[in-house]
From Swiss-Prot:
Domain tr-type G residues, every copy: 8-288
Keyword Magnesium tagged: no
GO MF assignments: GTP binding; GTPase activity; translation elongation factor activity
Organism: Sinorhizobium fredii (strain NBRC 101917 / NGR234)
Protein name: Elongation factor G
Amino acid sequence: MAREYKIEDYRNFGIMAHIDAGKTTTTERILYYTGKSHKIGEVHDGAATMDWMEQEQERGITITSAATTTFWKGRDGKMRRFNIIDTPGHVDFTIEVERSLRVLDGAIALLDANAGVEPQTETVWRQAEKYNVPRMIFCNKMDKTGADFYRSVEMIKTRLGATAVVMQLPIGAESEFKGVVDLIEMNALVWRDESLGAQWDVVEIPADMKDKAEEYREKLIETVVEIDEAAMEAYLEGTYPDNDKIRELVRRGTIDVKFHPMFCGTAFKNKGVQPLLDAVVDYLPSPIDIPAIKGIDVKTEGEITRKADDNEPLSMLAFKIMNDPFVGSLTFARIYSGKLEKGTSVMNTVKEKRERVGRMLQMHSNSREDIEEAFAGDIVALAGLKETTTGDTLCDPLKPVILERMEFPEPVIQIAIEPKTKGDQEKMGLALNRLAAEDPSFRVKTDEESGQTIIAGMGELHLDIIVDRMRREFKVEASVGAPQVAYRETITRQHEEDYTHKKQSGGTGQFARVKIVFEPNPEGEDFAFESKIVGGAVPKEYIPGVQKGIESVLSSGPLAGFPMLGVKATLIDGAFHDVDSSVLAFEIASRACFREAAKKAGAQLLEPIMKVEVVTPEDYVGDVIGDLNSRRGQIQGQESRGVAVVINAHVPLANMFKYVDNLRSMSQGRAQYTMLFDHYAPVPSNVAQEIQAKYSGQK
């Protein structure tokens, strides 16, 4: 099967929005107008279109897929292939948001015409900024009371520090909104209400809007000629670019993230969606318009580039794992280079395992389709992968590459969770395991002593969302305990311990003597073991028992029973008995030896230190810094980003609980923060005593 659409005719994009800006409705309308079986502009039987729309309205097209493939005929009459990638609504799910931003090539940022740029819009915008994602803006909900397009344009400049290039002006607002002025063609599009937005009339610009349209067209041209020297010179000499040239310049500036074309409409009332789709074709990049993806060559560890080309070796990134009621576990992957055939084996370079591609699906808005082959630029859902998790690279086994070394930080916060009814116990276990498979930064374990189920994640909000998803998706109601910080323990000085284990009580006895030097591991936080035994003081076959014994007690330190980090143990001497010694005897001896030594080797409590980034308007910088200092935070630096200030700090996790509420009230909801685990550091002694007293009582 040959490629159906050229790669330059692909658009992989997402819709970014504040939770209430109308993302679902806009996506639904896009899927409706681009629906595979009902291309607007082709099957133009109003009645059929109406029926389908009503049916879909009753059922509500819910986009349960992480990526939906659909098609659209551009202004030039040529079909394009769209892959719409779902970007999560929860911005605090940093890992997931950033991953979806990674696999899309461009985005539409939605604004609510009534609210303009809201705090969460700022957050999503800044994340897209970090990945340099080309964006267009759609000012939605123009029919809402209080809708104000021009105020939204102003807020983009003041709140986001971005340049919006206005491409359309609204005709009317609130309940009077009926169409838009196209500033390139200089005509007006007015939608017919009776066709549910499927049809519109191209008319002259209303007389009372002609001056405004001229003014905004002038601004549009002024902005776009700046990116092209020849066009700029011609413009200064009085020669205006023609419409095709304007579009070409808007496209270049958008892809280079110099500015953002802005459109308006109301998805709910079906007005303005088709021109937005034409704009996706005209202004957002295809996979070959953006820099080729870089990866690490598994063999040489050097950096390599994989171009978006079917003839390059296969490379793809698994960006989402979802459970599908019909197919089971589906792995969504973006193919960056090469092509993939059903039934072939691919290499998972992160897990170093081969995977066989069983079924390969293309997801459409209201159907799924089995496909035999997929190409560079495609987004596919793969069934039957056993080892692959989010963030893994799948590639040609002969040309291995790792596209992204996903560093999933260790969870830093944990809470006990239990189902509200005994009958939900099993359902809760299944739900938690599925959620853990989808999100590598979330873990589930059982506390051996209390038998409680413990969930661990990247922060309070992360775990709140998990509990919320359990309720919504798996219908399991759960109660949660208070959050607990994942402390650790270590040793701070060298200590030599000599220990003999003897047991004589009839029958075979036990005997083992070990002499071990314990010290902080200079190599880092892992456990290191070395044997310097010479002359057979401890026979070779017993040495693994010594290591195993120490490892078995590392999970519970001497101060408050927390796992231990950064310990090195060197076995230097020992003794054995021909009859009474065994691997088990040496295991017991080394276990007791370490327990004794840990108390004498300067045991110390460690706490997780978080890397906190706060993005705030300038007015609140003083308050934010003062507050972080009061939380034992250390400010690492600050910089301006657009009209906002970014403050970086290291703060102990124990002092970050409920921070989100404080920050919101301090900044009237305009500042936001992200928090990632950075490192472990010693707990100040006064705080350490409190923690020890609290936890020793529990152990």
